[in-house]
Amino acid sequence: MRLLLAALLALSGPISQALAQDFSLTIKDHKFDPAELQVPAGKEFTLKVVNSDVTAEEFESDDVEKLIAGGQSATITLGPLDAGRYEFHGEYHEDTAKGALVAK
């Protein structure tokens, strides 16, 4: 029994690290929240974008364009990214829907 418990505890480290690679953003009132999100450099990760507005919005950057209907969400796999700042915006509300991923 102790051996099983030790094995489960040893495995929980990699599991929690995998879970730490999932991030989320919310679109509300045509703004991204949080507006800046820190992500790991050099690793692939998933970004869930939840659109809480009733109207559609796009999550758009130099390399990604994803339309998200009002009240819906989308999961995007990104990376690996070099260390740096990667800006994104919402195409339909560019004046307010702005943000950045900061890879460290």
Enumerate the predicted regions with their spans.
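Extracellular/periplasmic metallocenter environments
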Residues: S24, G70-K104
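Asparagine-centered strand-capping/turn motif at beta-strand->loop junctions
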Residues: V49-N51
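Sec/Tat signal peptide C-region and signal peptidase I cleavage site
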Residues: P14-A20
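N-terminal edge beta-strand
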Residues: A20-G42
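Beta-strand-rich interaction surfaces with strong enrichment in secreted/lumenal proteins
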Residues: A35-L37, D63-I68, T77
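Bacterial N-terminal signal peptides
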Residues: R2-P14
